Amino acid sequence: MTTKIGSAVQGFYNKTPFPDYDLSRFNSKEDLALAAYPFAKILDRSIPANASVIDVGTGTGQLSAFLSLRRDCVWGIDFSDSSLQKAKGLKEKLKLNSWNLKKVDILDSEQIDAIGMQFDYVLCMGVLHHTGDAYRAFENIMKLVKPEGHVAIGLYNSYGRLLLKKRIFLAKTIFKNNNKVKDKYIRMQIGDVEDKERARGWWNDQYLHPHETTHTVGEVMGWFTKNKIEFYHTVPSTSLFAKSAFDISGVWSKAVSPSLPVQLYKQLGWIKSTNREGGYWINFGRKKASHSSK
């Protein structure tokens, strides 16, 4: 990535690989499985063992490494040398032979094409909003999806992120040197801050990141339509009668597409209900069979 934004983001992740971890924590594949976050385990259960998977913007590789434990073809791509170096250290230590790592700038369509294959599942979790052009990056990575392949796109929501933006402002001004407030803010998102590496990584990513954009459900539904991706559902749910703020049932199951009033109603609710996640939400869909990848 040669843009000013791209250089800043790349430099940020080269200094602060994300998610950060100490390699000594992982001495076996069992350690890796035990350390997987709950939603990673949900994804693992939702993706068939014989499916090919690519994690776009894999960072230090915890998600893609975990998914490779019971699959023969899992890729992780990123453009941060430091993050990939840590991921490669994990790959070598645990002998994760089915896990392929490659440096790729997702704004560069030629680098995307050079991957040379398509995948059954394309995951891009919390990445597009840190590029200089989220839609162009999305459009590029959709070339990696097989016809009838599945996608999961995680982004910051324009409504859900509002309270975190307020905290970011306070942390950079009034409470700039207040470690108690810093700890409080981190606890709001990840709970335990005894894991200093995780806490430092989250603080840097949420409060010190050089670039982020926010997006809406309707905007992403438009992206899906333009790229012949059938919209399935979101987590948190955009179903009008969803009871849970973070509905994890039926990953890649189809739901009724929300109308504009429902989209607005649900996203206004996310201001409070996704406060802990920083307004993060995931969009699920499936590529239509008739869509050509050329």
Q: Where do the PLM segments sit?
A:
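A short acidic, Gly/Pro-enriched loop at the edge of an enzyme's catalytic core
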Residues: 111-121
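Conserved class I S-adenosyl-L-methionine
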Residues: 150-187
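Conserved SAM-binding loop of SAM-dependent methyltransferases across substrates and taxa
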Residues: 60-71
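Conserved alpha-helix/loop element of class I SAM-dependent methyltransferases that forms part
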Residues: 25-49
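Conserved SAM/SAH-binding beta-strand->alpha-helix loop
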Residues: 80
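A short glycine-rich, Lys/Arg-flanked "PGG" loop and its adjoining helix->strand segment in the class I
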Residues: 135-147
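Rossmann-like AdoMet/SAM-dependent catalytic core
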Residues: 197-294
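Conserved SAM-binding strand-loop segment of SAM-dependent methyltransferases
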Residues: 95-109
